[in-house]
Regions:
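Active-site signature of alpha/beta-hydrolase-fold catalytic machinery across serine-
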Residues: 56, 85, 89
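Walker A/P-loop
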Residues: 66-86
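N-terminal pre-P-loop "Q-motif" helix
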Residues: 44-67
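SF2 helicase/translocase NTPase motor core
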Residues: 4-46, 67, 80, 91-213
């Protein structure tokens, strides 16, 4: 992507990546290819060098330090593919990752990013109500996934278990904001979050006094 790092962060960024490579005893490219079950060629097709570094350090943080990671790249660097790669990683490791974003139209964006990295087969369970704005569309505008009908959706919320037909979860922050008056969705997300991977898009907009994220 031919990106640059601010001078004030360049040394620290380089050292952080180098420390991870020393700890894992391999370079980040090899490490990420192994964790995402890619050949070296397919990894290069799916992720740029910058994205590989981000994914590698995120996976290292999860597996070794039991911590998360914040991706603070500017627009155009490809944070969506990093998020998609982490969803792929979670699914490959027996989890049902939870993707949370600010607006439902971003469900389509994450699906397209998953498509770009060769993971369009991963099936989302949409927490939001079934309506046109929550539909997931491919690059041609065709609807490929929709939220379940309300009766089936509510059944899943109540049993707090994801059926085998789904691989990961999509929700907006607004679905988590009514835990007092409408607790069923927040309770479901809370139950599903245990020992799981959360991918929080636009997470800086999830905090504050607003109840809508």
């Amino acid at each position: 992507l031919d990106t640059v790092v601010p001078d004030s962060m360049g040394y620290e960024t380089h050292i952080a990546a180098r420390i991870v490579e020393i700890k894992i005893n391999k370079d980040l490219h090899e490490y990420v290819a192994e964790k995402l079950k890619y050949s070296s060629f397919d990894l290069c097709k799916s992720l740029s060098a910058e994205q590989v570094d981000a994914v590698g350090m995120a996976i290292y943080n999860i597996e070794v330090k039991k911590q998360g990671m914040i991706i603070g790249d500017q627009t155009g660097i490809g944070k969506g593919r990093v998020a998609a790669a982490m969803i792929r990683y979670g699914c490959l490791n027996g989890m049902h990752p939870i993707f949370i974003s600010e607006k439902p139209n971003l469900f389509t964006d994450i699906y397209r990013d998953l498509t770009d990295i060769g993971s369009s087969d991963l099936r989302p369970f949409i927490v939001n109500a079934k309506e046109s704005k929550t539909d997931i569309k491919d690059f041609d505008g065709n609807i490929v996934y929709q939220a379940p009908d309300k009766v089936y959706q509510d059944t899943i919320f109540k049993i707090k278990k994801l059926p085998a037909e789904y691989d990961f979860i999509c929700s907006t922050y607004s679905q988590l904001s009514s835990s007092d008056t409408k607790p069923i969705k927040p309770a479901f997300i809370l139950a599903m979050a245990k020992d799981n991977l959360l991918v929080m898009d636009e997470s800086h907009n999830a905090s504050g006094s607003s109840k809508t994220g």
